[in-house]
């Protein structure tokens, strides 16, 4: 009996040490969000997640009254992609909700973050607040199910124009007036126009944003772009007084570019080919430093190694 107890305790001790080692190794690896690019049709959610994406980017176009209308990019778009796939925005949100609600037959546990690329270029500056207000109402009804067991993914509102910072204000104030200010815990922000980092910071000050900031940098895969601004964003992220929490680079379709982006310290890679990014992350040099982010990773928290 004593021998049996000794064996059990020995096994438990070894198991505990192994578990502690796994936790420590996980904590030392930067979590990476593989962002499936231009996922605008509901069926593409499955397609991109099955290829390895744990995040998707979806385009949102607005009508003349600042209502979010379609998930649609249009031409031109990335080389090698169809630019014309679309859904009604409300329908896409319902499909997305199913894909991110535990227990649903379409649920993907892996899909933890959604970037809405808000095509506000069709709007006047003074419509930005209304666009945020109407966007919030759509998400509240069709994605969050009015706060009753809705989709669980984190949401990034990506705005191309710094002058449209009031979209953030309209979104936040609407969730509050509708009785669900807590949902802002699931919402982050990005200005995607490749503006000067200092100008981006000033826009956030105007919007009253003090956290949950992703900073994008990039260009269509048809063209080349260096990593100098990415490195500037990473420097801001890692400084004691920076406003950026996470940095992502788009559109990355090649292994060499993926390695360069990871070496620069990004947290996310937006791609048309998630399997390419997964392959690079599985290379020994990168497997030791990075891991694919899960729902347990807070996308608003700056990674400290």
Swiss-Prot record:
Changing residue 37 to N: Abolishes enzyme activity. The active site is at residues 37, 73. Keywords: Cytolysis, Dermonecrotic toxin, Disulfide bond, Glycoprotein, Hemolysis, Lipid degradation, Lipid metabolism, Lyase, Magnesium, Metal-binding, Secreted, Signal, Toxin, Zymogen. InterPro entries: PLC-like_Pdiesterase_TIM-brl (IPR017946). Transmembrane segments: none annotated. GO terms for cellular component: extracellular region. Binds 1 Mg(2+) ion per subunit. Glycans are attached at residue 282. Expressed by the venom gland. It comes from the Eukaryota. GO terms for molecular function: lyase activity; metal ion binding; phosphoric diester hydrolase activity; toxin activity. Residues 1-18 form the signal peptide. Gene3D superfamilies: Phosphatidylinositol (PI) phosphodiesterase. This is Dermonecrotic toxin LrSicTox-alphaIA1ii.
